[in-house]
Amino acid sequence: LNAYTTGVMFKASLDIATDRVFNESGETVSNPSNWPTNLFYFNYNFYTSVNAIRKLALNNLPGDITDNSTTEELARYSIKRFKKTENYSCYYNYWIKHLDNNSPEMGVMEFGIVRNNIYRLSVNKVAGLGSGEPFIEPEQPDEYKAELNINIDVFPWAVRNQDVELE
């Protein structure tokens, strides 16, 4: 389960193209200072509200899906919410794989930090937009494809021999 899996969460700042943010009228909102606290992402565009998505891109979106819907409810329709703090951020979860069990279901000690090892993580590629919230589904038992391509090097601790004379 993810609740017992060792991983890392990366936080990235979004650099949103100003011609990709739309209001309910379908106009671009090109001045970032006019963007709301929450931006909603759907089908490679950002919207100022869920209602803007409903009007411009997803006409069959149920009326009970609103700006205040949960992350899980929005995800059912491939919508992501990004909250503005100092900027808009996204998050990527990556589980640290120590030993591969060659199964899509997480195995015991497959993901974890093992003592006397050093782990170096190198981000090679960002394959998509991360989550708008720092969220982990603790009950998820299966591995899933991360939006990041990461190279992991595991180095065992080195033994340093020293001669000692006791007097």
Regions found by a protein language model. Name each.
Residues 1-167:
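Extracytoplasmic cysteine-anchoring/structural motifs
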